[in-house]
Amino acid sequence: MRTINISLQEIFNEIPSEKREETRLSFAISNRLDALMKEKGLNKKQFADALGKRPNEITRWLSGEHNFTLATIAMLSTFFEKPIISVE
């Protein structure tokens, strides 16, 4: 039986840098939404109801794996009256 001798760092280094950045941004947006929901005292159901969405869609948004469109980010920024992301 062969032994696989590869470290997590080696695996991480094989992931293209743009994919790592995409993942970082996705989780940053999810974390921002979670923080803004807590700030407003909203749970997933209340947030979904306020936006006319289903709770499972909010769960997907908070998973860190959702590919947000600019339209959705703009809608969320308007809802919270705060930026979701900033562009420098």
Briefly describe each language-model feature range.
Residues 22, 44, 86-88:
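Recognition helices and adjacent regulatory flanks at domain boundaries
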Residues 33, 44, 73:
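Generic structural marker for isolated residues within well-ordered, non-membrane alpha-helices
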Residues 1-35, 39-40:
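N-terminal flexible/basic segments that precede or flank functional cores
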Residues 37, 48, 77:
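The alpha-helix within a helix-turn-helix
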